[in-house]
């Protein structure tokens, strides 16, 4: 797995093999950053369910100002910290080992926000369970309710095709959706409220 663009283009990243860890394929990351384009430049980024950090590190390579990574797996966090060091991006990053569902209790996370880009890339098995999908959709809405998403920010959510239920989101709406192989990527923004 390699970084696809920016100052660290071609840099090899360590990946883990697991049913719960699925780093986005390079072509998925290419699609994401082709759509985000200049949004990454200077962005404050939150990478939830970060795994080994390929999305956040790609954002940094393409000019993001700072990335806060969140993952609850000790194995993933070790690999992530190794990838950050290999890219020499320690000064632009912070890593929190915790569940993405518990971030709203973190003062540090709130103080570092709001975020221009939030990556939300949960394990597919979580979204395959009705309760898990409901928790994930609630998490996405709370990002807006808690003031973590910047006013013109984007949430980039990745899941298996046909899983996402956009109609259940109260605070976010889709700007664009792309399917790349067995992955569907949603670009979400705050819902526009009628005046």
Q: Which stretches of residues belong to each language-model region?
A:
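Class I S-adenosyl-L-methionine-dependent methyltransferase catalytic core
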Residues: 1-195
């Amino acid at each position: 797995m390699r970084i696809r663009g920016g100052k660290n283009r071609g840099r090899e990243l360590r990946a883990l093999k697991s049913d719960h860890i699925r780093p986005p394929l390079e072509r998925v990351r290419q699609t994401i950053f082709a759509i985000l384009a200049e949004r990454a430049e200077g962005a404050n980024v939150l990478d939830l369910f970060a795994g080994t950090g390929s999305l956040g590190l790609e954002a940094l390579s393409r000019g993001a100002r700072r990335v806060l990574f969140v993952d609850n797996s000790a194995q993933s966090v070790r690999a992530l910290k190794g990838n950050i060091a290999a890219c020499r991006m320690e000064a632009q990053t912070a890593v929190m080992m915790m569940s993405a569902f518990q971030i709203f209790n973190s003062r540090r996370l709130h103080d570092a926000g709001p975020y221009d880009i939030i990556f939300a890339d949960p394990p597919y098995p979580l979204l395959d369970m009705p309760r898990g999908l409901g928790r994930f959709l609630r998490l996405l809405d709370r990002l807006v309710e808690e003031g973590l998403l910047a006013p013109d920010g984007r949430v980039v959510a990745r899941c298996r095709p046909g899983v996402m239920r956009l109609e259940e989101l109260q605070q976010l709406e889709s700007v664009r959706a792309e399917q790349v192989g067995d992955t569907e990527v949603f670009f979400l923004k705050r819902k526009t409220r009628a005046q």
